[in-house]
Structure formats: C-alpha cells, structure tokens
Amino acid sequence: MRHDSEDISLLVVHNISLPPGQFGGPYIEQFFLGELDANQHSFFKVIAKMRVSAHCVIRRDGEVVQFVPFHLRAWHAGVSSFAGRAKCNDYSIGIELEGSDVVPYTDAQYQALTELTQALMERYPHITLPRITGHQYIAPLRKTDPGLV
C-alpha cells in the first residue's frame, strides 16, 4: 500500500521481453504473477525468484494488461530517484512496453501509451509532462530501458 495515493506524481516507462528479445507468449504475465517456470528457458533461472511488478504492460498489438491497481504500489523502479526524491515506487506508476532497447516499439503501443498517459494525467494531476520519464533516468547506473521511446 502507498502512504498516500494522492502523492502519485510520476509516470515511469519501461520495457520488457521474456525471454530477452522475444515477444508474445505468457512469460511476462507469469513473471509478474510469480509463476514463471525456471525450466522453460535458461534466462528464467536468473529471474524466476525475483518479485517485481508493473501497473500495466502494453503488448506489441497495443493491448493494455493491468497487473496492479494504480492507487497501489507496484515494484517496478527498484533503487531509484527522480528530482532528488528516492524510492520512486512510492509515488509512481510503472508502465512496461513489451519490447527491447533496440527494437522499435509499434504504432499500436505508442497509441495505447498515449491514451493511457492522458487518462492517468487526468486522474492524477501531479503527473505532468515533465514528470513522465524512462527507467534509465531514475536508475541511470542500472537500467537502459525503455531506450529511445
């Protein structure tokens, strides 16, 4: 639970593909739900016990899948800070684009991200254009996603 859902003031865009560089399939959902079978792929052995989540994933076809209600905390940012404030999970919403740093996102993803962002900005007025950022900017020594969105 967040201390104060009215404090939601940051939107963080990420990317994810499981296995890395591969799109489609059930693995992202399984990962966020803690149900990823480590035996399905060698990379999964590294991440299967991790407990992470995002509020939503936007698939390659533009489908938005929500995992965590927006007023609750998701575990997407890790060790992070924005504008001098640490612990971005406490006050942000995390959106994952199914993709990678080196493969362009689809038009359908951009459209869905635009619509979702507009709705979130209406619901959470402290999320303004300067407070929409990529994971690489809140955790610059650890992360490179979402790349050049």
Where on the chain are the PLM-derived regions?
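N-terminal catalytic cores of peptidoglycan-degrading enzymes
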Residues: 1-86
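Basic/polar, cationic surfaces and motifs that engage anionic cell-wall
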Residues: 86, 91, 100-149
